[in-house]
């Protein structure tokens, strides 16, 4: 099996993301292995030594340290291993355009700066107010997600938190009063999540099956119940006059991008 080694002088997430995106185009015939913290010549030699068949492997590197990066390229050439350096050409191009020498800081994405702590704070916020009955966080949230159960509210909250955005989610259910705080904040912050009824029924039935619920609890995935819930949610969203996004078969990343462009259209995240 062909293997892509995602190599970095930091934790390797960027290299792994590029490697996974590449491997995805070829199905199960390509495997990805992350190799983080390659910071010395010895680390490079150890990496090269574990690649048994150069014809069935390649390296995707985000190593920033110039001497290590160049040594890795040299060893790959000597060993007949294909290598693609992701950051090198980008850094060189920007350096040329700006006529400025780069700082070559490994792991710059994870630098312990204000953005990092903002991300941690947002993660804690999302966890604290996930499907919570405590509505005190609504006025402090950057984004408030509202929608039925299984419309990706929680994954979206966590994804947005990873961008440093405080996201809070409110489940909509006919039996539960809508928080008054929703009517007291800027409606631009509120995002309604809707979904195709048949798709929602399918998702809920799958969840019920996985949780081995007894038949008396199948109301959750009942078609009539789902339609009633969707009608209720639609009524609330129209009353709030908030932006509504259809999440049917939409990736979390795509939905999050739409949300950020809508809420933060006047500033950069």
Swiss-Prot record:
Record keywords, A-Z: Kinase, Nucleotide-binding, Serine/threonine-protein kinase, Transferase
Q: Name one GO molecular function term.
A: phosphotransferase activity, phosphate group as acceptor
| Superkingdom, natural source | Bacteria
Entry binding sites for ADP = 147-154
**E.C. number(s) listed in UniProt:** 2.7.11.32, 2.7.4.27
Q: Which InterPro entries does the UniProt entry name for this protein?
A: Kinase-pyrophosphorylase (IPR005177), PPDK_reg (IPR026565)
Q: Which residues form a coiled coil?
A: none
The protein's annotated catalytic reaction(s) are: N(tele)-phospho-L-histidyl/L-threonyl-[pyruvate, phosphate dikinase] + ADP = N(tele)-phospho-L-histidyl/O-phospho-L-threonyl-[pyruvate, phosphate dikinase] + AMP + H(+); N(tele)-phospho-L-histidyl/O-phospho-L-threonyl-[pyruvate, phosphate dikinase] + phosphate + H(+) = N(tele)-phospho-L-histidyl/L-threonyl-[pyruvate, phosphate dikinase] + diphosphate
Q: Which Pfam families match?
A: Kinase-PPPase
PANTHER family per the UniProt record, alphabetical: PYRUVATE, PHOSPHATE DIKINASE REGULATORY PROTEIN 1, CHLOROPLASTIC
Q: HAMAP family of this UniProt entry?
A: PDRP
User: What function does this protein fulfil?
Assistant: Bifunctional serine/threonine kinase and phosphorylase involved in the regulation of the pyruvate, phosphate dikinase (PPDK) by catalyzing its phosphorylation/dephosphorylation.
Q: Which family does it belong to?
A: Belongs to the pyruvate, phosphate/water dikinase regulatory protein family. PDRP subfamily.
What's the protein called, per UniProt?
A: Putative pyruvate, phosphate dikinase regulatory protein
Q: Which organism is it from?
A: Clostridium botulinum (strain 657 / Type Ba4)
